[in-house]
Amino acid sequence: MKVAVLGAGAWGTALAGHLAVRHDTLLWAREPALVADLSASHENARYLAGVALPASLRYEADLAAALDHALADNALCVVATPVAGLRGLFRAMRDAGKVPAHVVWLCKGFEADSQLMPHQVVAAELPEHKSNGVLSGPSFAREVGQGLPVALTIASASAACRERTVAAFHHGAMRIYTGDDVVGVEVGGAVKNVLAIATGIADGLGLGLNARAALITRGLAEMSRLGVTLGGRAETFTGLTGLGDLILTATGDLSRNRTVGVQLAAGRTLDDILGALGHVAEGVRCAQAVLAIARAHAIEMPITQAVCAVLFDGVAPRDAVSALLRRDSKAE
């Protein structure tokens, strides 16, 4: 099978390496200098240092050439850009007249200005395209790059998209589950990043494991309330792309969003933290969108509100925690 992976960040690189073990895989990067480095070393020293990539993996800086690779019969296009780059990439496909038959995206979050979910952005740019979906689940790029076990879910209304995705990814140490709750999967992927900032703050303040467990559990309730209201199914949020991804992101030391929270608790500014990370922390990007959507639907999300207060309103992390603890008792 031919597979084109569009986006050579940590996640795109790790998945391209996995795919290249079995398939004719091409990894597209926006920067020619990065493509040159990848081709010479078979290592993404910028985003996934120390992880060796298969010699069979090929690299391309020309988007048109990468799309041509994905236009082959039964090929798969994997879009590995952040949410902020999703619309532009799909618009480029449309404008070039090079829209692959089967497309999956990996990004987690809401588009900042429109507050749209990724599938809504795709539908706006490619309204006639049907064989598409989101691949998500509890996964750190570095562990996938190292060949460690992982389980992901492909959510799509298209059986053809689900079948192509399983055929591409389900081998080695990677297990793929299938479903059709695109809304639930996308809401889970967005909200868990915001909640991971909250658990990072609690861990950074030394509030203990009890507090972490409470935040994860009550955070899951926030995620479920929002997701069901937006059209997701309740059972999705106790699966891999809901609770599973939340546990990993909220507790794992490789989590960028959790790291943001830990560093905020240590007194560092958000600008300094993001500058030092050198990677996208989607929880910061989409926190305000999540809260705005919740308020528009009169959904109570106090943990998300507390995270936004720390990120954008200058509220001290310890004060935000105190405000949560002062909330009135209620039925669970």
Curated annotation (Swiss-Prot):
Its main location: cytoplasm. Transmembrane segments: none annotated. One of its GO terms (biological process) is phospholipid biosynthetic process. It is found in: Cytoplasm. NADPH binds at residues 11, 30, 108, 141, 256, 280, 282. InterPro entries: 6-PGluconate_DH-like_C_sf, 6PGD_dom2, G3P_DH_NAD-dep, G3P_DH_NAD-dep_C, G3P_DH_NAD-dep_N, NAD(P)-bd_dom_sf. Keywords: Cytoplasm, Lipid biosynthesis, Lipid metabolism, NAD, NADP, Nucleotide-binding, Oxidoreductase, Phospholipid biosynthesis, Phospholipid metabolism. It is an enzyme of class 1 (oxidoreductase). This is Glycerol-3-phosphate dehydrogenase [NAD(P)+]. It comes from Paraburkholderia phytofirmans (strain DSM 17436 / LMG 22146 / PsJN). The gene is gpsA.
